[in-house]
Regions:
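Extreme N-terminal "head/tail" segments of very large remodeling/mechanoenzyme assemblies
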Residues: 1-187
């Protein structure tokens, strides 16, 4: 029996009736870009991860920001009441919070009374933080952007947030900059 005969008579292990271009196409919405501004220790500039919808592996030393980025993406995807920070690192529930990421807490110092006090990169209320993720579906030829903007109202201590869902590609530099702390300018 020739190899041509084997090839012709052997049944494929998996048969997909779609054309090869459709069968190999990535299904669903895939993350294409992730941006952060003033999130954790990612401070004062826009930091971005471009992966074009490909799989991505975050690597780095302890304390390099891997869990901070994962928590940022999780913040965009999980309802606030169900959000648990730093699960990727197996940390205690109270170790990180929305406030710790907003202020950029990176260490603690003892005050005059001996109590530990968190030290952050950003002072209270004079900044805003932004998380933004773009997702694209090749099959639907559609892009969706999810974003959250965090800020403090004057005289308040609780971090406020604005949710954004837009059926197009947005970015922080173009769409979420230069409004100071005037969140009404965004709406």
């Amino acid at each position: 029996m020739s190899s041509d005969t084997l090839t012709e008579t052997a049944a494929p292990i998996h048969s997909d009736p779609r054309p090869v271009s459709q069968a190999t196409q990535r299904q669903g919405f895939r993350l294409t870009r992730f941006e952060v501004l003033n999130w954790g220790t990612f401070d004062r500039q826009i930091w971005h991860l471009d992966n074009s919808g490909d799989n991505c592996l975050l690597t780095g030393n302890i304390g390099s920001g891997k869990s901070t980025l994962v928590d940022g993406l999780t913040t965009l995807l999980v309802p606030p009441r169900k959000l648990a920070f730093n699960k990727a690192a197996g940390a205690e529930n109270k170790e990180r919070s929305l406030e710790s990421y907003f202020y950029g807490y990176y260490t603690s110092q003892q005050d005059e009374s001996g109590k530990a006090r968190a030290v952050g990169l950003r002072s209270k209320g004079n900044h805003y933080s932004v998380l933004l993720a773009q997702f694209h579906s090749v099959a639907l030829q559609q892009t969706i952007t999810l974003a959250q903007i965090f800020w403090l109202k004057p005289g308040e201590n609780k971090v406020k947030r604005l949710f954004v869902v837009v059926p197009e590609a947005l970015d922080i530099a173009t769409h979420f900059s230069d409004f100071g702390t005037q969140i009404k300018a965004l709406r």
